[in-house]
A protein has these predicted regions:
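Bacterial N-terminal signal peptides
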Residues: 4-15
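N-terminal metal-binding scaffold of metallo-dependent hydrolase/deaminase domains
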Residues: 17-66, 401-406, 421
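Divalent metal-coordination and catalytic microenvironments
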Residues: 37, 55, 73, 84, ...
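Divalent-metal coordination cores built from histidine and acidic residues
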Residues: 80, 95-212, 217-237, 285-306, ...
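Active-site environment of divalent metal-dependent phosphoester hydrolases
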Residues: 87-90, 115-120, 200-206, 244-250, ...
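Active-site core of metal-dependent hydrolases
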Residues: 209-322, 337-339, 377-379, 400
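His/Asp/Glu-enriched, well-ordered alpha-helical/loop segment
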Residues: 319-402
């Protein structure tokens, strides 16, 4: 059977099917030929035909083809990723959330801090061919009264959570190695996909540690982070670390973490103390260290776009853009692995990508590769995803226009394919 892509195109307001196949990999599926497409190779688009065979991408025509889709010279890219969002959890409207992620072409999501019980409640809806794929850290490691303890308090006050959802569930308060010894086994029993840790103004750790005025604005002793990283790596787990300022970025690198969550400057206010913009500037030596160690850095800069460039805070917007541009240019200089993550509960990485594009640090090809490949690789480092290569999972998006010429084309998705299955509108809704 041969069909044109126009006959398969899914409306951006449609609902997507998901949730009837067990496991993360599909059983035997149709052998589908995708002809007359322009396929992104990480740098440019090359015109060729691709095939999905049992959920795997190949560019060699199989002996038998069950269906042929004419891509009509449109542009094929890997799916997008979201390397930092806490919104895949039961307090959210999960069905609507999944629909929106798929609509936006985001197939892979990383949740770096969640309630283990919340993960259990959404498990049946995710990590299957017709849905999004998600990894979870479960509870994060911080100091008593440190971030994210204030989130637990807020949800208790709202009647959503109880005290049991705090220390030992959503987070683990750790003051020293003895306390880590007592709680580490409990944490591992939750079967995390990776480890989330927190550094907040770590150069001021001793002053903040026992002072209640810094509630929610403090994190781990940076010396203790070294031990956590060692234990995590011994258990086969990667470590992600929340940072606020450049001093935290430095401490995370010294500890040997695998991923830094947020670039310094993702927020420059809110703390008890006022901080100069210079405190958020990454040092040249730290950028070189991040590149040398292969550390992933998740951006989380899109919040700056909410500051009206022509409004009363125009100067703050200008300063934020200048800082973000400076740090991105430095990380780019040393080829640091940059992944996109929004940390925006009600949004995703589409605005994040558009904001970074507006800074004109990266050409469209590099930004697209960051969003598709690097982001996917830090979410699922052991899977063959994020690139349109022989033997990789047959997951991709088809765009109406060329995103290398106009990056806004990333919002013009005409077809979505995940593990060899064409995602279609749910006609029952």
């Amino acid at each position: 059977m041969r069909v044109a892509i126009a006959a398969l195109a899914v409306s951006i307001i449609a609902s997507f099917c998901y949730g009837q196949t067990d496991g993360n990999h599909p059983k035997e599926t149709k052998r589908i030929a995708f002809e007359n497409g322009q396929w992104f190779d990480g740098h440019a688009f090359k015109r060729k035909d691709g095939y999905a065979v049992n959920g795997i991408l190949t560019f060699h025509r199989p002996a038998k083809v069950d269906e042929t889709v004419d891509l009509e010279d449109q542009f094929v890219v890997p799916p997008f990723g979201e390397a930092h969002n806490h919104n895949v959890e039961p307090l959210n409207k999960v069905d609507e959330l999944i629909r929106r992620y798929l609509e936006h072409g985001i197939f892979y999501v990383k949740n770096p801090n969640n309630l283990p019980s919340g993960r259990d409640q959404v498990a049946a809806k995710i990590n299957r061919p017709e849905s999004i794929d998600v990894t979870f850290s479960n509870g994060g490691f911080t100091v008593a009264g440190g971030h994210p303890a204030e989130i637990v308090k807020r949800n208790i006050d709202r009647g959503f959570w109880t005290e049991a959802d705090g220390d030992g569930a959503f987070y683990y308060a750790i003051a020293d190695e003895a306390e880590l010894d007592r709680k580490w086994a409990q944490f591992l029993q939750t079967k995390p996909d990776f480890v989330k840790t927190y550094l907040l103004f770590s150069d001021d750790y001793k002053a903040r540690k026992d002072d209640p005025k810094y509630y929610g604005w403090k994190g781990l002793d940076p010396a203790l982070l070294v031990t956590i990283v060692q234990r995590a790596h011994a258990a086969g787990l990667r470590v992600s670390t929340h940072v606020e300022i450049a001093a935290d970025f430095h401490a995370a690198l010294v500890a040997g973490v695998d991923e830094i969550n947020h670039m310094p400057g993702f927020r420059t206010s809110g703390d008890v103390k006022t901080h100069a913009m210079s405190e958020f500037e990454i040092a040249d030596s730290e950028a070189r260290a991040a590149a040398r160690q292969g550390t992933y850095v998740v951006t989380t800069l899109g919040g700056a776009a909410a500051i009206d460039a022509k409004g009363p805070d125009a100067s703050l917007r200008s300063e934020s853009d200048k800082l973000n541009r400076r740090n991105l240019e430095l990380l780019k200089k040393y080829h640091v692995k940059l992944a996109l993550g929004s940390d925006s509960y009600r949004s995703d990485t589409v605005p994040e990508a558009l904001y970074i594009e507006s800074l004109h640090v990266f050409d469209n090809s590099d930004l697209l590769a960051m969003w598709c490949a690097t982001t996917a690789n830090t979410i699922f480092p052991k899977r063959l995803i994020g690139s349109l290569k022989e033997g990789y999972e047959a997951s991709f998006l088809v765009l109406k226009a060329n995103p290398l010429e106009n990056f806004d084309a990333v919002q013009q998705i005409t077809l979505r394919v995940k593990q060899g299955k064409i995602l279609k509108a749910d006609q029952s809704r």
